[in-house]
Amino acid sequence: EPTPEEEKKAAGIMKSLKAEHLMDRPVVAMSSGEQVKVLIARALMTNPELMILDEPSVYLDLAGREFLLKTIEELAATRPDLTMIFITQRIEDILPVFDCGMILKSGQIVASGSRDEVLTEENLKNAFDLDIQLIRTDKGRLWTVIR
């Protein structure tokens, strides 16, 4: 049974995730996006130093993905002590929040380093065997065009 302090902390975290309406709803009655919010809230309850996000946006619709990315961006800004490892096949999901990263292909490192060192057309071509053109928007988002 949670203590009053834990209940207060949980309510604050759920409010910050705009998910307070989910506090009494069974997980099986939640959408995939709602479940992601609850999982992030559960992780934040422990004040982690490290969060591993393994394909967190895979089942989310466009609105859910945008919310997730904004949440991650806010966490990066408000929790400088929190290291997040974000595993994804959607490179646009990790911008503009990642400081450093790597691209893997068949378990081998294709590139590692800063965002600008990693996200190059050459590295992406080597990783995915595709002719890719990168286009960065003014907000730091990245779009890929396969030629």
Protein language model features and the residues they cover:
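ABC ATPase nucleotide-binding domains
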Residues: 126-147
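Catalytic Walker B motif of ABC-type/P-loop ATPase nucleotide-binding domains
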Residues: 51-55
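H-loop/switch region of ABC-family ATPase nucleotide-binding domains
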Residues: 88-89
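Helical segment within the ABC ATPase nucleotide-binding domain
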Residues: 66-80
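Conserved ABC ATPase signature
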Residues: 26-30, 34
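Conserved ABC ATPase "signature" region
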Residues: 4-22, 47
